Regions:
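Active-site-adjacent beta->alpha loops and helix N-cap segments on the catalytic face
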Residues: 50-55, 71-87
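A short, Lys/Arg-enriched amphipathic alpha-helix followed by its capping loop at the start of a domain
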Residues: 37-39, 58-67
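Hydrophobic faces of well-ordered beta-strands that scaffold small-molecule active sites
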Residues: 39-42, 67-71, 90-92
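Glycine-rich phosphate/pyrophosphate-binding beta-alpha loops
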Residues: 43-49
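Short alpha-helix boundary/capping motifs
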Residues: 32, 89-90
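An N-cap/entry alpha-helix motif that binds or orients negatively charged groups
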Residues: 1-35
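Surface-exposed amphipathic alpha-helices with a cationic face
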Residues: 5, 9, 59-63, 83-84
């Protein structure tokens, strides 16, 4: 524990004051796909209980935002319908 604590204490956050942040790029890649930010839509089962469009709504939102949608095997409509709703990458 002591070594862990000493190692953690050795880290320091060094704020960079007066640095131009007018053009920040938080994009990254995941499995070869470019993401706008390093945030992805987690698979959620039974989305149709929240919105009638279910997985289609999430797939469209993920595509519009520029991220990846992980699709649950228990959501509706079918995986094929969700895949057809957008040509943006999806992960099952």
């Amino acid at each position: 524990m002591r070594r862990n604590r000493l190692g953690f204490d050795a880290l320091a956050l060094r704020p960079r004051v007066l640095v131009d942040v007018s053009k920040v790029d938080a994009s990254t890649t995941f499995l070869g796909q470019k993401l706008r930010i390093p945030v992805m839509m987690a698979p959620i089962g039974s989305l149709q209980t929240i919105t009638p469009e279910g997985g289609v709504a999430v797939a469209k939102a993920a595509a519009e935002f520029g991220t990846i949608n992980f699709v649950s095997s228990v959501t509706q409509p079918s995986l094929e319908e969700i895949a057809a709703s957008t040509n943006h990458p999806k992960i099952f």
